[in-house]
Amino acid sequence: MPTWHYSTDIAEKNPEKTAKAMMWDAPISPKEATELARVIRGMKLTEAKAYLERVIKMEEPVPYRRYHGKVAHKRGLADKHGIPMGRYPVKAAKYFLKLLKNVEANAEFKGLEVEKLKIVHIASHKGMTIKRWMPRAFGRATPEFERRTHLEVIVEEVE
């Protein structure tokens, strides 16, 4: 049986002021998860949740810094983030919002104030790939691969 660990030891240095949460095998793209994690890293928890709500409503795009090949420019994105390419990863934003609500519940259970929580660590890692093959004509087959992503977040109470 495997054991899962966080990719950092921030929470072990100050366990009474931090809360953490994980999500394994989320059915979202690892590339979209990487871009979303980069944007909300360092935000206050309430700001990050509001930002993800706007992404889900397709009101505010997510800047794509690394995986931006053939990605269209979005109005106002370059002024705010310094990069004009972006998209609206709605499905990934829903899973990130679920993760942030989970870490908020964990923080409340530990007695931390939600308004003072800041995201000090958030990361996404490639998970397993579920491989399926759709039979086609003349004995061929088309791959239908479903990628999974592991997510982790650590929040800390700041003054």
UniProtKB/Swiss-Prot annotation:
GO terms for molecular function: rRNA binding; structural constituent of ribosome. It comes from the Archaea. This is Large ribosomal subunit protein uL22. The keyword rRNA-binding applies. This protein binds specifically to 23S rRNA. It makes multiple contacts with different domains of the 23S rRNA in the assembled 50S subunit and ribosome. The keyword Secreted does not apply. Belongs to the universal ribosomal protein uL22 family. Keywords: Ribonucleoprotein, Ribosomal protein, RNA-binding, rRNA-binding. Part of the 50S ribosomal subunit. GO terms for biological process: cytoplasmic translation. The gene is rpl22. InterPro entries: Ribosomal_uL22, Ribosomal_uL22_CS, Ribosomal_uL22_euk/arc, Ribosomal_uL22_sf. Pfam families: Ribosomal_L22. GO terms for cellular component: cytosolic large ribosomal subunit.
